[in-house]
Curated annotation (Swiss-Prot):
Protein name per its UniProtKB record: Imidazoleglycerol-phosphate dehydratase
Annotated family: Belongs to the imidazoleglycerol-phosphate dehydratase family.
Pathway: Amino-acid biosynthesis; L-histidine biosynthesis; L-histidine from 5-phospho-alpha-D-ribose 1-diphosphate: step 6/9
E.C. numbers: 4.2.1.19
Alphabetical UniProt keywords: Amino-acid biosynthesis, Cytoplasm, Histidine biosynthesis, Lyase
Top-level EC class as recorded in UniProt: lyase
Pfam families recorded: IGPD (PF00475)
Subcellular locations according to the entry: Cytoplasm
Catalytic reaction list: D-erythro-1-(imidazol-4-yl)glycerol 3-phosphate = 3-(imidazol-4-yl)-2-oxopropyl phosphate + H2O
Lineage start: Bacteria, Bacillati, Actinomycetota, Actinomycetes, Mycobacteriales
The encoding gene: hisB
NCBIfam families the record matches: PRK00951.1-6, PRK00951.2-1
GO terms classed as biological process: L-histidine biosynthetic process
Amino acid sequence: MTDTTLRHRTARVERVTKESSIVVELDLDGTGRTDISTGVPFYDHMLTALGAHASFDLSVRAEGDIQIEAHHTVEDTAIVFGQALGKALGDKAGIRRFGDAFIPMDETLAHAAVDVSGRPYCVHTGEPEHLLHAVIPGSPVRGTGEPGAPYSTVLNRHVFESIALNARIALHVRVLYGRDQHHVTEAEFKAVARALRAAVEFDPRVSGVPSTKGTL
């Protein structure tokens, strides 16, 4: 049995490019406290939901070229979150490794499954076709009153792929049914959050890394 009494798995990752500047701080053993600022209000809402429902303490500070569009900032933030997740997991000793969750939101039902395998892969399926073209308007950014960038729901797949590839996890996200672009997207993020929560939590019956290979 792994002694996890005093262990907090944390990471801080910073990434700066010509398109964005991102800092993510993550505590996998938190209580769901979040402090998110990306300049894309709907994305802030989704990352807040992810942190809260995964019970991660999550801080995100992102500045990007949102005057062009939100794509770079959204994708780069997901990359850095994935890197922080992988770093915080460390050697993965004592974790459950697998997790999945169904999340209903009004007319929508979404499902996510995670394997903290060290083999990055993402499957994203089932979104209604109109989400390829849907845009959620940007509300005023909290604390500034300035208009935030709109969020195109075609970015959902980019987010989940970026998290999976950079955290080195297998992540499957599917929408069983749904219509409203807000509900579909939020159900997906919450399903991913709950699946991650289950996968990264400690299993008192597991000693060492949960793999017959001895490493993940």
